[in-house]
């Protein structure tokens, strides 16, 4: 059983955004070797990009015909890896998630293409992973609209991509129930931010308190009528405020 986390400390200042060189696979955004920054999340310098290839389809397919569809595929694949790591009680690096978010914001036109993917009607067989990809896109668009700097956008994107991991602790019956939930089921659903926070701190420790806090505060609201703590205004993580707005 995961240990109860200690109270959150203030978010540490982000390190300078240095670049590191990675060569992306052919056919994906950023084909030219490019300078990449040292992780703004935590830990040592991150490793190279994973391959994410696009599948062939007819030109009417809004996914296959989108030049950034590989980012959607990589996002979904990462979510699956993260959920599997939780199931196996393993630690997974966030390097791949950081690379995905960086590629989303690196080129000015990328976000419009990604938004097209997010609003497309897609099969629901991978509904949670697709929801998290869509949520990341919406969150990043909001962050860009607020003129957030690159380091904050990367943290925002990573947090939004995994913000619902606490749902793993909710019974499948409730998660997949059609129709109205009972008051007891609603109460169980409302525990998932706590589960998510515990998962992050268990995996990554206090160095990632900012991420645990973003996930824990996602359902808090400015007027204090959210949950689980009823926080308001400045008590709520700035990342969580954006994540909450984008959660559709």
Regions inferred by a protein language model and the residue ranges of each:
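Non-catalytic interface/linker regions that flank or bridge core catalytic/transmembrane domains
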Residues: 1-127
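Short alpha-helical scaffolding segments that buttress acidic/His motifs in well-ordered protein cores
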Residues: 101-104, 115-119, 139, 156-160, ...
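Alpha-helical phosphate/pyrophosphate-handling elements in metalloenzyme active cores
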Residues: 125-156, 195, 201, 230-235
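Conserved hydrophobic/aromatic pocket- or pore-lining residues that grip, position, or stack substrates
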Residues: 135, 139, 163, 189
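Divalent metal-dependent phosphate-bond-processing catalytic cores, especially two-metal-ion Mg2+/Mn2+ enzymes
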Residues: 144-148, 205-206, 243-246
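Histidine/acidic-rich helix-loop-helix segments that form or flank divalent-metal centers
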Residues: 160, 201-240
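Short active-site segment of divalent metal-dependent hydrolases/proteases
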Residues: 166-167
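Divalent-cation-assisted or electrostatically stabilized phosphate/pyrophosphate-binding catalytic cores
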Residues: 177-198, 223-248
